[in-house]
């Protein structure tokens, strides 16, 4: 991006580049490199807002220190609140597709995931999936989300990750609804909480945030490698673990509760480092 974005700016005579702020270690490094490259051409990189309901760093204790426990974070998060979605649409700006900019190298093909992904991309698909969930899934979300045998989750995680829909849009649609609305909003709060954790403690991307887990047993050697391979292939002999890993291999998706199970199994039962 530090090479291509300045090239696009030069081609279209851009005077500024606006982005949604990123708070992950990778995102900060990437954006810093892009900002430095643009600065040479006198073009500012302007970060506005964030892909979260409440941006990391805004929810703090009375002494301005960050929260380490979710429940008090959640209570303060609700009190801080968030803005309504922007009242804009596809005609609010002149959108530029980089693929249509002449003089750029051809876009690289994404790697083949070797699965038939059943999740259409883009904002239209995100809004359609969200509307379907509101109509057919939200009312039973609080209970059905824990059932891997049911389609009880929203399947919005990839759309949130890649920014095809903003959580403020989701929260606005949850407002005033009963059923699973409260449970779903709490999940959005968990997303904000761990973004805040990563922003405050970036080393948690590589090391245990809770140092008590540094003493957990870890295996190595050929036996550990064989166990890891069996885990990846869904051939551990534990049905729920294997079902989850085979679902991932076959569809590119794994149910949220099963993600917790397979991760816990890898670390606590197979004694392999996450």
Give the ranges of each region predicted by the language model:
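A general alpha-helix detector
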Residues: 17, 155-156, 169-173, 243-244, ...
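Helix-loop-helix junctions that connect adjacent transmembrane helices in secondary transporters/permeases
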Residues: 203-240
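Alpha-helical packing segments of well-folded alpha/beta enzyme cores
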Residues: 1, 126-133, 170, 240, ...
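Secondary-structure transition/capping motifs at alpha-helix termini
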Residues: 40, 177-178, 204, 251-254, ...
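C-terminal substrate/ligand-recognition segments
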Residues: 195, 229-272
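An acidic- and aromatic-residue-enriched active-site/binding cleft used to recognize and process polar
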Residues: 22-23, 50-51, 164-165, 190-193, ...
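Glycine/tryptophan-enriched, flexible segments
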Residues: 64-215
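Trp/Phe/Arg-rich N-terminal binding region typifying the photolyase-homology
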Residues: 1-82, 180, 246
């Amino acid at each position: 991006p530090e090479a291509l974005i300045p090239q696009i700016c030069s081609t279209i005579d851009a005077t500024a580049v606006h982005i949604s702020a990123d708070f992950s270690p990778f995102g900060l490094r990437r954006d810093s490199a892009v900002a430095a490259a643009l600065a040479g051409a006198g073009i500012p990189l302007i970060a506005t807002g964030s892909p979260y309901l409440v941006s990391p760093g805004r929810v703090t204790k009375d002494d301005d220190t960050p929260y380490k426990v979710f429940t008090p974070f959640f209570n303060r998060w609700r009190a801080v609140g968030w803005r309504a979605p922007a009242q804009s649409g596809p005609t609010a700006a002149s959108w530029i597709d980089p693929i249509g900019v002449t003089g750029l190298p051809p876009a690289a093909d994404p790697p083949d995931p070797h699965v038939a992904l059943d999740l259409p991309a883009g904002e239209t698909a995100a809004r359609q999936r969200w509307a379907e969930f509101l109509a057919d899934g939200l009312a039973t979300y609080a209970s059905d989300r824990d059932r891997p045998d049911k389609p009880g989750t929203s399947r919005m995680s990839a759309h949130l990750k890649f920014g095809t829909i903003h959580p403020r849009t989701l929260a606005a649609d949850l407002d005033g609804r009963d059923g699973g609305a409260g449970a779903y909003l709490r999940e959005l709060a968990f997303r904000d909480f761990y973004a805040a954790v990563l922003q405050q403690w970036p080393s948690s991307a590589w090391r245990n945030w809770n140092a008590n887990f540094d003493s957990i047993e870890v295996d190595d050697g050929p036996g550990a490698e064989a166990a890891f391979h069996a885990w990846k292939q869904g051939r551990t002999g534990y049905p729920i673990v294997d079902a989850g890993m085979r679902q991932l291999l076959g569809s590119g998706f794994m149910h949220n509760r099963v993600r917790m199970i397979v991760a816990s199994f890898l670390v606590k039962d197979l004694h392999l480092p996450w």
